[in-house]
C-alpha cells in the first residue's frame, strides 16, 4: 500500500488509488473512505505487515535561503514496524499511509504516522 502518489492531510481519492494500483494485485481491491484505504483479506492466512512512518520535512531546501548550507538538512526517517498476523478471509483492514510534510526553511514538522487496524 502506498500514498497513491499524493500528499496532504486529506489523503488520496478513490481515482488516485485506482490509478496508483493499476496492474497490481490490489487493482479493484482497495476502497477509499475519507482518505483511508480499506482492503478485504482475500484468503485466511498469516500475513506479514510492515508499516513505515513518513520521513520528516526537509529543512532549508530553498537555495536562496541565506542560512544554507549551515542549517540545510534532510528530514529524519520514519519508524518501521513489522509483524506476522493470522487474518481471516473477509476481514477488512483500514490502512492510513503517512505522508511526508511540506519542506520549509525553518522549524519543519515530522512526517505522518502510518496505521493498519481492523475495521471493527
Where do the protein language model's features map onto the residues?
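Short, surface-exposed beta-strand/strand-loop-strand elements in extracellular ectodomains
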Residues: 58-79
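Extracellular and analogous surface-interaction loops
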Residues: 23, 28-31, 36-47, 83-90, ...
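A short beta-strand element within beta-rich, extracytoplasmic domains
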Residues: 46-55
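Extended, low-complexity, turn-rich repeat/linker tracts enriched in Gly/Pro/Ser/Thr and Asp/Glu
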Residues: 55-60, 101-105
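Boundary/junction segments of secreted and surface-exposed precursor proteins
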Residues: 1-19
